[in-house]
Amino acid sequence: MIASALAGCLGGSDDDGGDEDVMGCTYADATNYNPDATKDDGTCTYAEPEPEPEPVMGCTDPAANNHNAAAEVDDASCDYGRSHADIMADYAAGTIDFGQASYELEVSRKCREQGSNNPCEIVEMSIGDASTIDPHDAYDSASGDVIEQVYDTLYRYAGDGTGNAIIESRLATGYSVSEDGLTYTFTLRDDVYFSNGDKMDASDVVYSWCRVLGYGSPDSHVGWILEQSFDCNDADGNHDDMGGASFSVISDTSFSVTLFAPSSAFISTIAYTVGAVINADLCEANRVDAGGENDDYCHEWMDEGPMGAGTNAYTVQTWVREDRLVLVPNWMYWESGDYNINRHTVS
């Protein structure tokens, strides 16, 4: 009897048990999660995973014309335009005009900015404003800094990498000297164009050097650099006789000049900016009182570095004196390669 009584006290009845489990989905990341469930019943369902976003397709090469900075995967669509050489060959052949050539060259050669560490535009604080952009009457450094970017010479000064200066060829491809040391015969590049598309030839060089003597550089007197070496007739624009006995135009790419006396420094003198080559036809077209007492030898026109006057890498877009000067590329520039600066402001 004792055993039966103890059993009844310890076991209790079935109706007297604890709370029943609440069945349901107990996983919080399930779409049917039940926060009240105390026991998982295997019914959890889950949302379909979000699909991976499609990568942005496009040209990923910063050097291409159609570079897409947002592109993640290259789609082989990169366009580099036609080469400088091919465009200029078509221009020389007359297949395309100046407008088309300029457009294609800009597309092909322009700087493409790749973030703040590779800007295509720079602003430079100058030591002072240029006095003129006429290379045949400029002697100051501020003018020279601009002139060297707009006009070119047969030879120029350059560094040799060790701190010494050397002279390297630019518009000339070479020269020879007669046995008596008096006559220099130059050969010129045949692929040089002024910024307006006119082709440069030997008569432009003769005209330019004789203009220095004819105009006389009244403000700077820089003309003495050439005056000591040779003379001309009167730089009146007659390409057949303007050089007088000193000059001979042999062909479009060759001419000779005879000096007063042998000079080992002659190449050095013509490497200075006073030896720059200008567009003879445009200068003649813009002379004031040509042949008269007030002949300006196109100085008023040349003073601000007009379009078409030079053959170097840049042209003057804007010049507000004592404020700013803006240089932009001469897309017709003869050296191959792309530009790393599309706009150079000097202020």
State the predicted function of each range.
Residues T173-H221, S256:
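Aromatic- and charge-enriched surface segment that lines or borders ligand/interaction sites
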Residues T187, H221-A290, V320:
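Surface-exposed binding/hinge segments that line
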Residues A158-T162, P262-Y339, R343:
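Gly/Pro-rich hinge or "lid" segments in bacterial periplasmic/extracellular proteins
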Residues M1-E20, P51-E52:
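Secretory targeting signatures
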Residues P119-D129, T183-T185, V205-S208, F255-V257, ...:
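Short, well-ordered beta-strand elements
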Residues T38-A47, E72-Y80:
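Short, disulfide-bonded extracellular cysteine-rich repeat modules
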Residues M125-E179, A309-G310:
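N-terminal lobe/hinge region of extracytoplasmic solute-binding protein
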